[in-house]
Each structure stands twice: as C-alpha cells, then as structure tokens.
Amino acid sequence: MTKVVVVGDGLVSAETLAEAALELNIEEPVEVTKYHWYADLNKEQFQEKIKLIEQKGPESVEIPAGILDDMKEADYLLVHIAPVSKAMIEAAPRLKLVGTCRGGIEHVAVEELKKRQIPLIHVIRNAEPVADFTLGLFYALTRNIAFSY
C-alpha cells in the first residue's frame, strides 16, 4: 500500500490534491489521507498566515493536528502553501517525495529534505502568463494604448 498525505488550504482544497494524488503513477493500491490547513479562514486572515511563512519559514506556523502520526507511514506528501516543517519530514522515514503546487518553496524545510535526499517538486503554473501580462502592461503604458493617443 502506498500512502499519500495531502494538505489542502484556503486556495487549493485537500479534495483537489487528493484527486491529483490518485492520478500519480505510483504503486497501487493508494491510500490518501487528507488534512486542511487554515481552509476556514477569510482571505485577509489566510494572507497573514502566508505572509508569516514567507517571512519566517515553515516552522513559524502550526501544522495540522495529527499530521505527524500520519507522516510516519507516508510515502508522498502533497501541499499547496501549507508548511512542510522539519518535524513533518523527521516523522516520515518512508517519505519518497514532496510535491507543492506553487512556485515558491519558502513553506518547505528544504535543507531537511536535502539532508535526507528526498526530492521536492514544485509546479510553477502561472509564471509564463504573469510574464505575458507584465509585458502587455509595459507596451500599453509606453505606447499610450490605454489612453488612446
């Protein structure tokens, strides 16, 4: 049995991550355990948690209650912005891979993963559209397109 732990949040739900986990090309049967990290906060409150992680790293916020127990048997961990703390990694002797669906990795204890030679995959989905939009704004402004002259 392959065990995947997923941690959803206010932007990417645990259900979405669980669906993605079931599509992975990994040994079956697959058991997915779902956690929610501050999914019940309003936008401003959630942004404060994100800001804290971005400024102080994954150890600066609480991890979901009970997750350390499930990490003991976890083969894979999938998150969005939820912290991947040193304690979570230390609790997971079977961990083969951590996946995060965002460009930044400030929410992950990268040094601990390196120490244990556990791969980290981070999916960057919006880098190209953001660059396109930025260049479009640049042209619109420098050529006065928005002002029609």
PLM-predicted stretches and their roles:
Residues 75-149:
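Phosphate/diphosphate ligand-binding glycine-rich loop within oxidoreductases
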Residues 1-74:
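N-terminal glycine-/charge-rich "phosphate-binding" loop or analogous flexible N-terminal tail
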